[in-house]
């Protein structure tokens, strides 16, 4: 883990966060663990508190769920790099936020890889049923899977999650399944406005 971020507000600019699995923990943890003693670490037994995080011009690298947690977070003009550790499948995000939260919002970012095979990297999967990730006006490399997003292993409650996309370009941009919400221009603009207001205090 390169960074554990657990404060009411956080701002990172021009920072490189490099790792493999679980590079950036955008706290808080989910309310409940799935396995006994599954939460070990800071604030594992403390009440959960909402956090708003803002990342600008950052490079974040990893392979499995390398941006994860329950924060409301905005990533602006960042480079999101999947490391090629010769895994059959990789995942960028694993959100676990509240149903009424914002989740992770990526705007004008570059999703690149270290020569990962085409179609082997998912933009995200829900760590908890209400996880959310939105990808807006981003450039996606060929490593991004055509489906875009994935359920969490064999769980059947992923229909509560919200994965959204608008304005994607590049070899990894594709027609997604019905599970991924396609936002129109007005919806994407409103989501970005809300994210900036919450995470940048605009």
What are these regions (language model features)?
Residues 1-202:
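Sequence-level preference for short, compositionally simple segments enriched
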